[in-house]
Amino acid sequence: MDCSLLRTLVRRYCAGEENWVDSRTIYVGHKEPPPGAEAYIPQRYPDNRIVSSKYTFWNFIPKNLFEQFRRIANFYFLIIFLVQLIIDTPTSPVTSGLPLFFVITVTAIKQGYEDWLRHKADNAMNQCPVHFIQHGKLVRKQSRKLRVGDIVMVKEDETFPCDLIFLSSNRADGTCHVTTASLDGESSHKTHYAVQDTKGFHTEADVDSLHATIECEQPQPDLYKFVGRINVYNDLNDPVVRPLGSENLLLRGATLKNTEKIFGVAIYTGMETKMALNYQSKSQKRSAVEKSMNTFLIVYLCILVSKALINTVLKYVWQSEPFRDEPWYNEKTESERQRNLFLRAFTDFLAFMVLFNYIIPVSMYVTVEMQKFLGSYFITWDEDMFDEEMGEGPLVNTSDLNEELGQVEYIFTDKTGTLTENNMAFKECCIEGHVYVPHVICNGQVLPDSSGIDMIDSSPGVCGREREELFFRAICLCHTVQVKDDHCGDDVDGPQKSPDAKSCVYISSSPDEVALVEGVQRLGFTYLRLKDNYMEILNRENDIERFELLEVLTFDSVRRRMSVIVKSTTGEIYLFCKGADSSIFPRVIEGKVDQVRSRVERNAVEGLRTLCVAYKRLEPEQYEDACRLLQSAKVALQDREKKLAEAYEQIEKDLVLLGATAVEDRLQEKAADTIEALQKAGIKVWVLTGDKMETASATCYACKLFRRSTQLLELTTKKLEEQSLHDVLFDLSKTVLRCSGSMTRDSFSGLSTDMHDYGLIIDGAALSLIMKPREDGSSSGNYRELFLEICRNCSAVLCCRMAPLQKAQIVKLIKFSKEHPITLAIGDGANDVSMILEAHVGIGVIGKEGRQAARNSDYAIPKFKHLKKMLLVHGHFYYIRISELVQYFFYKNVCFIFPQFLYQFFCGFSQQTLYDTAYLTLYNISFTSLPILLYSLMEQHVGIDVLKRDPTLYRDIAKNALLRWRVFIYWTFLGVFDALVFFFGAYFIFENTTVTINGQMFGNWTFGTLVFTVMVLTVTLKLALDTHYWTWINHFVIWGSLLFYIAFSLLWGGVIWPFLSYQRMYYVFISMLSSGPAWLGIILLVTVGLLPDVLKKVLCRQLWPTATERTQNIQHQDSISEFTPLASLPSWGAQGSRLLAAQCSSPSGRVVCSRWESEECPVLPLHPGLPHKARYGCCRSSLEMPT
């Protein structure tokens, strides 16, 4: 054994097999293999405890504080707080410490509570009882004590305690059914298969007698991928090696169904299970708003440093004159006079930093997080986005990208299952040029369709009849369909009846396969079932044919085909293969290729999904060679997928073409309307699909991506066969630039309205040539730039024959182009996950191809039509709200701090604060925080119906329109202007002591309180003026926050607080309000402060209105006209009356406008004076108007 171990080490590290460290070896039942067997290096594995919590009782405080102070804003305010503690600063440490303490405490309580819930869930899971096999008997232990190598028994409706290799079940065929709803959301039953050599072990003693080792890959989070092999030792013979795949793996979290019990061996436990590995979140995506917010913070940080530096310099300039540095009432001590000048200057600089630090809003981060978290529920609560048929509603997997939904410039969408229903219906099949459709049967004979007779001029004959039946057998055998037989039931141990063809219900992860099997059933051949590795079909003579299933060459999106190897009762071995025409035709050496290709292209143009079917007969020697090739690839632990692909390539060649099938996939409801609305919103839509060009092109026309006026440009393999890639790209570039002229960012993002209507079609092979390096070793960047130049001048792009990674390449190419547009990817299948993860926003459609797309997406919706409301309504609102929140926070903090800066010029730069400590502390926490939070949750600047009806409003917020530098500078200067009004208005009004009742001048605290009062009123009323959508909650919060400020000030200044060391605010607020000039000053200053913003909005709405502002004006006029008496409406002019009569003439003298269904309703011409709402009346209900 030692020599064997040494040999293993030498081979592993000296013979180039170092990659083997990526695998693990497991002794089943902890039994070592017999003497002489291969030795393995023992490894240490974790126990089966699941720990999803982040903290423990001991490390919660230090770890949570460390995580929170990793955020730059929190760390910044911590530094400010420490500076206030260390040096003599003008403000109390409470002013910075209390807000920081509040933010840290709220976050810690929230995270602590969430972690406590995780602890409870972990304990319940770890203490769950599990049945082990130990010395041939069942032993019950807690789940956390399970170890790798233990043999476990799981009963029906129990959850698997760890990741298990399926050894056996009570079923004779060695299968079991599981549901994985807790893992991927799929509630359908999935079939898993036991190891071939262990499926007969039905008792504890049988399983305990097993001697085997399992070699498998190290843990990785992909739920649908697993590579391993099992070595079963029988006596002293060489071990039997069997491959292990995902069909043999039972995942922790899945539930056993319709199976009494199973036995399995633990291979991944605890935090190494796939379920635990999927706890880790996806890579963090950052929205454009968040990036802008961080940029603005840096700007304000620079302003803060500049203010502190200017005041420090001016302080020493001012103190340079005699007696200013040391007045008679504040003489310095000897030690103070001898202090280093630079040290004093640095200390003063820090003190000014503390004084002005409130320009950085500490509460903005908390408010933004609350707004995103609470706002995300508006999507999940939206009843319009709930699908009754599926019983599913939208899902929000992250709330960090809500506002990004309002910034999308490119949409990349899958076709099958996203634009289409993925509900396949068999239409026809073509066998050697003859076309067959269901139900065309006469006297038991299948007749060719009349539309296909002209393709050949003779009947099939005897040879054709054989090929015809061989074609139907190929369809019945080449698939992975399961049969749910109502007569057979689930009890396989009892007597079985022969299944009735009419009672068969087919189940498959691929709707295409179900449609094909059901289609040939209507043509006379019925697939019955797979039993004991034999496939049974019922032919048109009602005889049951049995074929032994020898091998399955599974489908993958790269090969685009699948095959089966079967053996008939007469001993003949066949390989049946079906797949895409581009995948089958190059491997065909015999058959009527031209006739079949012609029919395939015709069906593709009609939008049908096509597959080609071929076969070849294998000699026993050929089958043995194929078996050895497949077995070698299947048991490989390294590069198994690559080796299998090479083996498939060797086997699937020299085929005989049988024919082709056509399946219809209907377009989803309102898919065309959704794409049309998105294009009107200025969003470019690209379709990325694996289908052939003709099929995808027909779908694009059906969904209005391409129109009759669209000039299609092709960049396909067929085109490249005629010209070089360089020539094709330059020709296309000249074509699109001939009418487009110079390119702008608007043309790139699809927002240009004068773009020529070009459509581009590119296939996967052409994209590979564009993306790969040049033959001369130079970069292919120039090809990419040419390609992007063509794409940015096309209104729509179709990418066909795309592999999953190519979809992600396309998204990445556009995402990182020089314009950096915001991208969105939407799909429903596992092949769409790569592009969903690559795009700025990923949306999964909850479809029929599983939940992988929905699980890996940022948002999930039931149907493609729901994308319209998600972007045009929710995305629009989210962006408007969050951008206003960010700008408003900076604005109100400029208003807050700039008077403090101005005050230093009147107090000798002594760092005297203008506001009381309580006001400094509560300004951002209590007085001004709730109104903007409610605004950012509930604001609707235009109605929901208007946004859905007019998609062009989406253009007004495109390209981060509300957070550009121009808008940011406007808000900043507005804050500076208001601060100047507050400070100097109060200063000049109360500079003359005659305006007060008793002739005394206001003190600095009364002056500061007056400025603060005007400021709170102005910033709150500014928000009220910006509010378009009022509810009782808005009224309560806005006016309630003002009343709270007044009540607090009365209480704070009306009581002598014994715990305070000072009483400087006593009677200040009451004294201020008792002065008539103070009331006059408040009213005047608030009015002047709001005036510029009001004037700007009035002038812009009248002179340079945006589309949104025009819509708001129309809505305002409509609301007024609802109360206008009918007699006051403008009369119809003669010209308008004649026009109306001409348009509305009909034989009955009436015009009837019916309810809108699927086509555009003609809009009746109305007099300009009529209310705007009347324009849409005919679309809502039947309307009759006399001529």
From Swiss-Prot:
Question: Per its UniProt record, what PROSITE patterns does this chain match?
Answer: ATPASE_E1_E2
**Post-translational changes noted in the entry:** Proteolytically cleaved by CASP3.
Subunit comment for this entry? Component of a P4-ATPase flippase complex which consists of a catalytic alpha subunit ATP11A and an accessory beta subunit TMEM30A.
**Which CDD domains does the entry link to?**
P-type_ATPase_APLT_Dnf-like (cd02073)
EC number of the protein: 7.6.2.1
What spans does the record annotate as topological domain Extracellular, numbered to this chain?
83-88, 319-349, 906-917, 990-1003, 1054-1071
Q: Which residues lie on this side of the membrane: Cytoplasmic?
A: 1-61, 111-296, 373-884, 938-967, 1027-1032, 1097-1138
BP term (GO), one: positive regulation of myotube differentiation
Q: Which catalysed reactions does the entry list for this protein?
A: ATP + H2O + phospholipidSide 1 = ADP + phosphate + phospholipidSide 2; a 1,2-diacyl-sn-glycero-3-phospho-L-serine(out) + ATP + H2O = a 1,2-diacyl-sn-glycero-3-phospho-L-serine(in) + ADP + phosphate + H(+); a 1,2-diacyl-sn-glycero-3-phosphoethanolamine(out) + ATP + H2O = a 1,2-diacyl-sn-glycero-3-phosphoethanolamine(in) + ADP + phosphate + H(+)
Q: Give the annotated active site.
A: 414
- Phosphoserine is carried by which residues? 740, 1148, 1158
Protein known as: Phospholipid-transporting ATPase IH
